[in-house]
Amino acid sequence: MSSFPWLTIIVVLPIFAGSSIFFLPHRGNKIVRWYTICICLLELLLTTYTFCYHFQLDDPLIQLEEDYKWINIFDFHWRLGIDGLSIGPILLTGFITTLATLAARPVTRDSRLFHFLMLAMYSGQIGSFSSRDLLLFFIMWELELIPVYLLLSMWGGKKRLYSATKFILYTAGGSIFLLMGIPGMGLYGSNQPPFNFETSANQSYPVALEILFYFGFLIAYAVKSPIIPLHTWLPDTHGEAHYSTCMLLAGILLKMGAYGLVRINMELLPHAHSIFSPWLMIVGTIQVIYAASTSPGQRNLKKRIAYSSVSHMAFIIIGIGSITDTGLNGAILQIISHGFIGAALFFLAGTSYDRIRLIYLDEMGGIAIPMPKIFTMFSSFSMASLALPGMSGFVAESIVFFGIITSPKYFFMPKILITFVMAIGMILTPIYSLSMSRQMFYGYKLFNVPNSYFVDSGPRELFVSICIFLPVIGIGIYPDFVLSLSVDKVEAILSNYFHR
């Protein structure tokens, strides 16, 4: 048990400090904006300090544990703790949220509510990644949905209400299965405190019941990740959301589904995961091809990037399904890698829209000359998205490939077939990625528009882009910086499996 409540402070600081926004003096949006950025920076620095000085990398067990009685009558506990699996997503959340807050500068309507919702979302995401209690995990999972719905419905495009409604129907529908499974799992055959992760991990279930729990949780995570065919909310949501919200969706929210799949399904329900893993591999392989084939047909720039996210998230599903050290480490690395790349692409798409007021690719063209900085950064992140060697996407996807090939669970021919189909998907990625850059930046279409004068990226946009680009290059050159966080925890998780 931790002697000082570091994690509790980290979880509650954003939402509590965010509540003070409504009491700030009415002197324009500048005070609100800088106050929010300072809170995000303080939270990020506090998180980094805690992990640097109080977290042991070589210990696969839960660290900085906190356990407080919450609701005595129901024996509910406030349990928090971190390990190598959660530390990466938590740091990613702090980094992306801070930059998304900086990116939200153009938002002026209801600025107080907007920034409060971003901070509330911050707390929900940190709470989900650090929860050690099934009920607390569910509460944080749901807490994070409400701000997203409001951010979509109030600061989106013309079809924002449709997109927000579709988002909440999909995610709340998936959460119903989570809500049904958690009480059953927490209360089944145990006299110890219910809902504790450790208690649930040591609990053995009948095979049929474990499969039922697994399938229910899988539906909830398949909506968030997303996994086909439960992905259709994502393109609509990204197409209408403000780009700072898109950064949080692509960078963090999608990763919560993959995290839950590892943390609960894989760690707490190993026998069912061993049964379902071939199906995860098959669905993930289909998803790579499907999303990469669908993306080129999208006229909307942000929808095309959204489908590329669906394709790249499939590598995480495949890595989790491989049940190997290499594959799971590759999946965790892809969670971090795509968090940076996806957030950056949506940010640059949004800044481009702010200048040319166009979102359809067939209406764009020729903006490379008037906006060379945006062109350079967008092209760089497009290269990262198509897994160019030397960047994080290449390392993550390559490790997932090795995880499939070295998996003893699958026969030789299925492994070759899956690898071949995934390779086709990787070939399709440059097609939609490079064609997107060609339609945006090359040609002369926008030069024929009267008064076509466009302002290039300013210091704020350049700063955000470089801050995201540096980790992408850093992880691509030295991936062990991220892998060292999770490697011991991955071995501990896979020790429950017979197929290593």
Swiss-Prot record:
Q: Where does it live in the cell?
A: Plastid, Chloroplast thylakoid membrane
Q: What is its main location?
A: plastid
Enumerate the UniProt keywords alphabetically.
Chloroplast, Membrane, NAD, NADP, Plastid, Plastoquinone, Quinone, Thylakoid, Translocase, Transmembrane, Transmembrane helix
Is Transmembrane helix given among the entry's keywords?
Answer: yes
Ribonucleoprotein: is it a keyword of this entry? no
- Which Pfam families would you find in this protein's record? Proton_antipo_M (PF00361)
Q: Which domain of life is it from?
A: Eukaryota
Q: Which reaction does it catalyse?
A: a plastoquinone + NADH + (n+1) H(+)(in) = a plastoquinol + NAD(+) + n H(+)(out); a plastoquinone + NADPH + (n+1) H(+)(in) = a plastoquinol + NADP(+) + n H(+)(out)
Q: Name one GO biological process term.
A: ATP synthesis coupled electron transport
GO cellular component terms? chloroplast thylakoid membrane
The residues that cross the membrane are: 4-24, 37-57, 84-104, 111-129, 134-154, 167-187, 208-228, 242-262, 272-292, 305-325, 330-350, 374-396, 411-431, 462-482
Stated membrane topology is: Multi-pass membrane protein
Q: What class of enzyme is it?
A: translocase
Gene Ontology MF, one: ubiquinone binding
* Enzyme Commission (EC) number: 7.1.1.-
- Family label: Belongs to the complex I subunit 4 family.
Q: What is this protein called?
A: NAD(P)H-quinone oxidoreductase chain 4, chloroplastic
> Organism source for this protein?
Chloranthus spicatus
Q: Please name the gene that encodes this protein.
A: ndhD
